[in-house]
Structures are given as C-alpha cells and as structure tokens.
Swiss-Prot record:
Site keyed Transition state stabilizer: positions: N202
EC number: 1.2.1.3
Coiled-coil residues: none
Compartments where found: Mitochondrion matrix
Protein encoded by which gene: ALDH2B7
Protein name: Aldehyde dehydrogenase family 2 member B7, mitochondrial
Species this protein is from: Arabidopsis thaliana (Mouse-ear cress)
Pfam families cross-referenced by the UniProt entry: Aldedh
Amino acid sequence: MASRRVSSLLSRSFMSSSRSIFSLRGMNRGAQRYSNLAAAVENTITPPVKVEHTQLLIGGRFVDAVSGKTFPTLDPRNGEVIAQVSEGDAEDVNRAVAAARKAFDEGPWPKMTAYERSKILFRFADLIEKHNDEIAALETWDNGKPYEQSAQIEVPMLARVFRYYAGWADKIHGMTMPGDGPHHVQTLHEPIGVAGQIIPWNFPLLMLSWKLGPALACGNTVVLKTAEQTPLSALLVGKLLHEAGLPDGVVNIVSGFGATAGAAIASHMDVDKVAFTGSTDVGKIILELASKSNLKAVTLELGGKSPFIVCEDADVDQAVELAHFALFFNQGQCCCAGSRTFVHERVYDEFVEKAKARALKRNVGDPFKSGIEQGPQVDSEQFNKILKYIKHGVEAGATLQAGGDRLGSKGYYIQPTVFSDVKDDMLIATDEIFGPVQTILKFKDLDEVIARANNSRYGLAAGVFTQNLDTAHRLMRALRVGTVWINCFDVLDASIPFGGYKMSGIGREKGIYSLNNYLQVKAVVTSLKNPAWL
C-alpha cells in the first residue's frame, strides 16, 4: 500500500491553464521584456559533454537492470531525450544491497585504516576538480540550472564537502570514562553498516556529497538512488570514486523510480540506515517503510516554506537583492528558498516596486549561455505545478506584479513571478511551490511577524535582514527553524549543519553532526583485578 502511495505522489501532475495568467487579470507588465526573453530560449546550445554512463553501478561494475528496462532522461530546455538510462527496481536494489553488505563484511574497506580511507576521499576530491567542467555540463544538461552555477559553485562545493569529510575520517573515535568500581569503561564509534541514500533532483551533486561524504568517512557502504529526473552526474561521480581507489561494492548507484527502487531501499531488511531528501509527503512514507521493516535508522531532509523577514531599518536596495536571490536561486527549486517575504509596512511599497523591477531584469534563457541567471524548471510536472499555483494566487486576490506565465513555446521556462498583497492563508503562502514565484507579505511589528512566520507546518530555514543586533537576536531565538541566516542567505559551508524543525525533517546533514547519522555507539566494560588506580 505504501508503495502505491509513493507511486501516486511521484506521478501526480498538475495541468496548466490553457489561458495566459495575464489574461485573467488583464495585465501585461513587462510584456516586451518577456517577449525578448522568449525569443532567446528557442535556440538551444549543444552541451559540451558526452553521456558515457547510463547503466547501474553495482559491485564496481556498470551493469544493465535485471529487467532490461530503461527510461528516458529529458533535456528541460526542450523536452527532448538526452539518453536512455537503466531502470533499477527491487531486484536491482537486492543486488546492490548484497554487494554493499559483502563489501562491508568481507571486503578491504572495513579493514583499511581511517587514514587510508581519508586518502581515497582526498584523491576523489582531486578528480572532481580535474573533471569540473564535464561534471558541471552533465548537471546542467539534465537539470536545467545555469552552467555557470554548476561549474563555479556546485562542483567546487562537491569537492569541498568530500575534502571536509576526508579530514574527519581519522578523527572519529570513542571515549573512556570512569566507572564506579574496578572496571575499564570505553565507547567505540562504529560504522552503522549498509546505508541506503535517496537523493533529489534539485541539487543532485550537493545532496550526493552531503550523504556520501559522512557515510564513507565513517566506514560504511552505500546503496544510493538518484532522482529519475537527474541520474547522469551521479553515474560519472561513481566512476571517479573507483578511479580514486574505492573498493568494489562500497558505493552502488541505482537509477530508478521512487515507487520501485526507492521503496525497496527504505523497506529492505539488510539496509541498516536510510537517508532521504525530498518532499514531506514522501518522507512520511519512507519513515513508515523503515519502521515496518527492520526499524532502520532514518534521516529526513524535507520541505520548507522559509520566511525572509525585512525589518523597518533595512537598506531596501540590499534587502531586495538578497530576497531576490533567496527565492529565485536555482529556478526557485530550493527546499530552503525564502518563499515567504515578510516586509515591514514602513518600507513595503518601496520594496514591492523594487522587487518587481529586479524580477523583470532577471536574465532567463538557455543555461549554457553566459550570464544566464535562470534556466528551465526540471520537468513538465514541476512546470505545470508552478503554473497552477500562480493561477491560484491570481484567483485568491494577490496582486501579480511581474511574470505569471510560461516563457517561450518550448521547454519548461517560467517568467520570474512576483506577488504582493499576499495573505497568510493563500496557497501561494502556505504551500511549497518550488519555483520562481516570490510572495510578498506586509507586517507591523516583531511580535506579529514571529507568530506568522512560525505559523507553518515547515521549519527548515529563515532569513532576517536588519541593522539592529537586538532585533536579529530576538528573531534568531524566536523562529522555529533549523537555520537562520542574518543579512545573508544560502550560506551552506560544509561545516554548517543543515536540517529542519517540525515537518521539515529529522536529523542534520553536514558538519560534525552528520557523522552521528552513520555511527553506532558501543559501550565496552572490562573487569580489572587489582588496578593501580580507578
């Protein structure tokens, strides 16, 4: 039953309205600007990379799925097929888990010193940097994010995260503590075993690093499932891991769908831990499958509807630019996006006008072109879902300041969209849209905005923009979220833990805190006869 619900959630698709959103309100703001952009997205650039790996990576070898099935991965710029990828299912997960279990129980990986493991991870980081452009091109082709973002931010961050955890590998240790009698008492920090990891499509490389890095540093083996929308970059990364010297079976990569491969990992009796990043609805199902199988440990990084609070003392120009980045980065496809922009009434009108102007200037187009800020959404399902939410916003009475429709006639491009006069109970203010839609809400004082910001089922992150230290500290303490960015946003260094309160997840990724996700603590008590001291 849970598997069927996974299928329902993953296959759900909203149909977009055949009418322009502008026609609903008789609006045509920025029409010439968007007309020029629309013409620019029609001609696509040939990506500077070849697809070499489309099979599953199991036991150190690239292999076809047992069923022989494949599925297409699509170019979001035009909906055309990039490649046919092997479609893993439960049988393939069984093979991958068996390979991971053998590597953990019998292979050289658990017998290596921690220093030897760290050297492999450092070599891997070197290979990432060597292949930076190739990895970035695959990421952009499969996902649609700007190539400059992939090449200058995300692939370097991928290498940085693995260097961070390579440094941790030989610093993981237990403790000794005094007992109440003649005993030697110590703890051992041991790898948890076979870790199942399910990563999303919005940041395939970064989410892979946040999960693989600590798991490998702690000495575990892994079965990783990629998102069906973006399987390609992980397969190249898997090849580079083996070039770095990773033993066969330590990391196994299965491309496939949530209802089959994902559910098989979460419910597998020989998987000791599962980590998932994705929607809250699917996260609940992962938790259910884990509890009904072998009660495996679970880490969940789920949805968000993060408040971005602009206080009355803010420099409006700076606040507009930061709020724009907080929402529109990565086509708005960020779990922690600042998607509820709360602005103090004193500066609200000025902020709205400048936010509208900034959205109209946003450079949207083929992500392989230089200077592009926004590419297409990842697929037709996400594209149609976003357009439906925009329609909801218009019909609910929010004021459409900019955007509101698709851009161009092919591909999954959406105009940068800004709503003002948004009320807390509108769907565009409560639901995770996961797209380039900024909602701007007005507030009067701190007590009010704290209550409204916390009135959400989510609690992943928040942004605060103020020049007052007391205000910053009050909001920092009062907001029920896992991360608060003060006068900045999306600072995601490898050492900074990331995770949510409430329905935004369980546990933390990155930093020292993530190591606990992949370790067991064993207490060892040894009786001593005639000890010299206690």
